[in-house]
UniProtKB/Swiss-Prot annotation:
Chain positions covered by the region annotation Disordered: 138-176
Matching SUPFAM superfamilies: DNA-binding domain
One Gene Ontology term, aspect cellular component: nucleus
Residues annotated to bind DNA: 27-84
Name listed for the protein in its UniProt record: Ethylene-responsive transcription factor ERF008
Stretches with biased composition (Basic and acidic residues): 152-161
Pfam families (UniProt xref): AP2 (PF00847)
Record localization: Nucleus
Alphabetically ordered keywords of this record: Activator, DNA-binding, Ethylene signaling pathway, Nucleus, Transcription, Transcription regulation
Family annotation (InterPro entries): AP2/ERF_dom, AP2/ERF_dom_sf, DNA-bd_dom_sf
Keyword Transit peptide set for record: no
Species, as recorded: Arabidopsis thaliana (Mouse-ear cress)
GO molecular function, one term: DNA-binding transcription factor activity
Length: 176
């Protein structure tokens, strides 16, 4: 009778998700999610108690790629990575590995570059269902219509031109 109760308690705990919460919130090594939804990455320096802050990112993949870059620079090709296939071509001579001259600031800068690239790629996703339906759409973010009806990228670092501002540039959708 006690075994049945233990089995029932184990099954109930497993179906309720008790004990699996931490694994669900951290899909990759070296990252965590803030209360407000941003993903952050950090790594401990070898043989020290201090941590290297790698940045805050919109997606867990970007934070994980930043962590992978940092761990590769710190520990070399033998490091356990979240995405080992993406760093397979790099060697110690290409910049990664146990170089004694690598400062925390250098590692932070390199990791932030990679994370920012992944975030930027995720922000400009092009959806193309491409098919026989007449309702196929292609959505492009950060764009505006040019004079000939085509779409062109907008430089988000520049102030908007008051002459071309008509209020319709919130979202560009081009019918295919």
């Amino acid at each position: 009778m006690e075994t049945e109760a233990a089995v029932t308690a184990t099954v109930t705990a497993a179906t309720m998700g008790i004990g699996t919460r931490k694994r669900d919130l951290k899909p990759y090594k070296g990252i965590r999610m803030r209360k407000w939804g941003k993903w952050v990455a950090e790594i401990r320096e070898p043989n020290k108690r201090s941590r290297i802050w790698l940045g805050s990112y919109a997606t867990p993949e970007a934070a994980a790629r930043a962590y992978d870059t940092a761990v590769f620079y710190l520990r070399g090709p033998s490091a356990r990575l979240n995405f080992p296939e993406l760093l397979a071509g790099l060697t110690v001579s290409n910049g990664g590995g146990r170089g004694g001259d690598l400062s925390a600031a250098y590692i932070r800068r390199k990791a932030a570059e990679v994370g920012a690239q992944v975030d930027a790629l995720g922000a400009t996703v092009v959806v193309n269902t491409g098919g026989e339906n007449r309702g196929d759409y292609e959505k492009i973010e950060n764009c505006r219509k040019s004079g000939n009806g085509s779409l062109e990228r907008v430089d988000l670092n520049k102030l908007p031109d008051p002459e071309n501002s008509d209020g319709d540039d919130d979202e560009c959708v081009k019918r295919r």
